[in-house]
Amino acid sequence: PTEPAEAKAQEAPGAAEDDTVPAEPTTAACAPAVGTAMPLEKVADPVFSSGALGNGVGILPSEGRIVAPVAGTVVTAMDSGHAYGIKTDDGVEVLIHVGLDTVNLKGEGFSPRVSAGQRVDRGDPLVDVDLAAVREAGYDPTIILVVTNTASLTAVVPVVDGEVTTSTTVIEIDH
């Protein structure tokens, strides 16, 4: 009678593993806007272009709708609407920073669509930006997309190919 119990005990860990669905691995980040992608080094901001905040890309937007490049939880949504942090279910952390020094606009020209704590899917709107107003105020509207926890991942590789849409992979991620 002890044999079936032992067999069950041996099967239980395997059965438990089968019941647990691991988080779908995040293998890519898409462009957060339609526009032209560029290497991070070409972004006119020394902190971002140095890679100090992680590997990523710059995107000069041609449209003002900025969307989530990955699915996850919005962990940061600045009141000014210019920056968003998203953490995926498997721990990839991305920062979407809209424009250079645009925090100085204090939200003018930015219409946020999400708030901290909200779940988003890839492609969900984060903010609508009046690109003309940003330019008229003298600011560079380049969007910076970086993986802020690059150091804890196996590889974070920017894939830059000029014109992009919100379904274009701009960063490949390997755990």
Predicted segments, located by residue:
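Contiguous, well-folded functional domains in the mature portion of proteins
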Residues: E6-H175
